[in-house]
Amino acid sequence: MRSEDEALRGANMQRFQHDGVEIAFLDEGEGDPIVLVHGFASTAEVNWVYPGWVATLTKAGRRVIALDNRGHGASSKLYDPAAYHSARMAEDLRALLDHLDLARADVMGYSMGARITAFFALAYPARLRRAVFGGLGIHLVDGVGLPESIADALEAPSLADVTDSVGRTFRAFAEQTKSDLEALAACIRGSHQTLTREEVTRIRAPVLIAVGSKDVVAGSARELAALLPSGRAFEIPRRDHMLAVGDKAFKAAVLRFLAGQP
């Protein structure tokens, strides 16, 4: 049963069922479709609506579809880490395209959403036109990234009990977004899969990797781009992992990339 906060948050969202999970999503605008996949502890609203991405992309003539990942926002909450394997979350993305009868789409993910997008790109190359990996660079391959301490922080009795600085940041963010802390702890424990270098080279679609110049979570965009047959790196100036999301330079780079411009 959804909480009052979830009901209010999901009032304008559509829903469908997949893998026994209810997935909520926004669908706005007309034109070539782009699907937006948010990061850990975020939502479609927080990651894409509030920072102006939905408005920017619809104004550019795109149909914008943004889902709440399982365990997040108005979608179903699950408490088994195995339910959050990146490949299973990529299946939610594929099922969303099927539900909307979309043969292909552009896909943009941020942080965990970029990881999901990468798994989708590898599993369903025919369904992908172009991809944007925001807030995730070479750590997609080398496995460094969000630490296990985040799960401990989410399970702590209160924010005051969390001493780890990264854990405090994510606990505070999760509380701000009124997230289910237990579901998020399961998610962070279950979604840390990597791709091998060989698997990355099999992603043939054009990919833009955009990482903030002060991001200490994502890893190098240039190193990941060098592995991709059609990879392109973009450094978001003066931004860390959290502040890069709504950056104007990031938006401009994505619009150029989606339009096929250098």
Segments (PLM) and residue ranges:
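Conserved HGGG/HGGXW glycine-rich cap/lid loop of the alpha/beta-hydrolase fold
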Residues: 21-76
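Conserved alpha/beta-hydrolase "nucleophile elbow" surrounding the catalytic nucleophile
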Residues: 38, 105, 109-114
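Active-site loop/oxyanion-hole signature of alpha/beta-hydrolase fold enzymes
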Residues: 49, 56-59, 66-106
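Flexible "cap/lid" loop of the alpha/beta hydrolase fold
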Residues: 115-123, 127-158
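Hydrophobic, aromatic-rich cap/lid helix
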Residues: 171-196
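Short beta-strand/loop motif that positions the catalytic acidic residue
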Residues: 203, 209-211
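Conserved alpha/beta-hydrolase "acid-adjacent" motif
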Residues: 216-221
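Catalytic histidine-centered segment of alpha/beta-hydrolase-like enzymes
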Residues: 239-251
